[in-house]
Amino acid sequence: MFCPKCGHEKPQGARSCDFCDQDLNTPSDSTITDVVRSSGFVGRQRELGELTSALGDAISGHGRLVLLGGDPGIGKTCIVQELAAIADARSADVFWEHCYEGEGAPPYWPWFQILRSCVAESDAERFEAAMGSDAEAFGEIVPELRSKLPNLGVPPTFDPDSARFRLFDSITTYLKNASNDRPIVLMLEDLHWADASSLALLEHIIGDMAESNLLIVGTYRDNEVSLDHSLSRILGNVLRHDGFQSLDIGSLTLGDVGELVTLSGGSDMPRDIVEQAHRMIEGNALFVGELLKLLDANGPGETHAWQFANPLGNQRGHKQTLRWVVRRVQSGADGRRR
């Protein structure tokens, strides 16, 4: 169980939270489980609990970084979506950005997009107060800022290494200061596609976020991160930081798949069909969702019973239909794996 206020795990029988002094004997209007969306999210309770605990740390002033690794389509995005709902309920500002696949994106692209969102959602006075002494650097990377702060000066000229350090430091200072006013959660998806500069900035922020109300959550495909990948080097370097945690997201269990089937109206699906589906799709969360869509494109309907798209209407026919659906899923869902 978790504290309804800060999200930290609470010991059995505890009367108050050790982190925020919340009275655990008094019912809360908003608990962690209340804000987990009822959109078919099953399983992953351990992972969501770890992320919720990290959120509690950040809210309490201990900055955290959590990276989620796993196969494409395994459910990383779904997990962080649930965390975003919890963070929003805890009055944190949540900013979300994906790294760009392919060539052509400028350096620091995901960070610049996040900073643009920060500029758009913050009033000029609050933003200026959080930027610190190197505010001019922001005008170079986020041109929209100059419309809010027309008197913003031009940064002095430095050699490339010094300029990069000042840029990193100014962004880190802003995020730390802004999070003191209101906790900030940054979601960085698809870090396996991140450019080296973006990862270097991430490493810099990690080294100076311990005393902040900042939580950074990143996702990546572990099968696309080789030993010589820039992200592998980052992972090796951040292991020494107390605020870092890595979560490996595995396959859904047979029980999880069965629960998804039930939530989709398939409580009457034969167990051996559920077991075969679990084996064939190897517990991949995206494949499960696509499989359920294709088995009955029209949903469970008013009968709330599963309708097999199969005219044979027998066990052998069900299994043949399942094989056909899995082939369709595997050919059509590959491009949408996350």
State each model region's role.
Residues F2-R338:
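Key residue(s) within conserved catalytic/signature motifs
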